[in-house]
From Swiss-Prot:
Gene designation: rpsO
Similarity comment: Belongs to the universal ribosomal protein uS15 family.
Coiled coil: none
Skewed-composition ranges (Polar residues): 1-10
Protein name: Small ribosomal subunit protein uS15
Record's keyword terms, sorted: Ribonucleoprotein, Ribosomal protein, RNA-binding, rRNA-binding
Amino acid sequence: MAVTTDQKSQVMRDYQRAAGDTGSPEVQVALLTTRINSLVDHFKQHVKDHHSRRGLLRMVSRRRKLLDYLKSKNNDSYRALIERLGLRK
C-alpha cells in the first residue's frame, strides 16, 4: 500500500528541523524509509514483482546517498537519525 498524505505529513512533522522544513536530509531520509518499509511489506505478498523491486533498490540507493551526505556534514545528526529510524544494528 502506498504512503498516504497524512502519513507523509506526520513524518515531516516528526523529523523537521524547523516549522515548514520539508527538504532537509533528515526529512528526506525519513520519507524514503517510510516508503521503503511500505514496499518491503508489499514484496512479502508479491514476490515476483520485479518491476517494483527496481524502484525499491533505487530508493535504497538514494537514501544511502542522503545518509552519506548527512554523515559528512553533521555526524551527530546522522547518528541520531539512524538511531531513531532503527537503520543500523
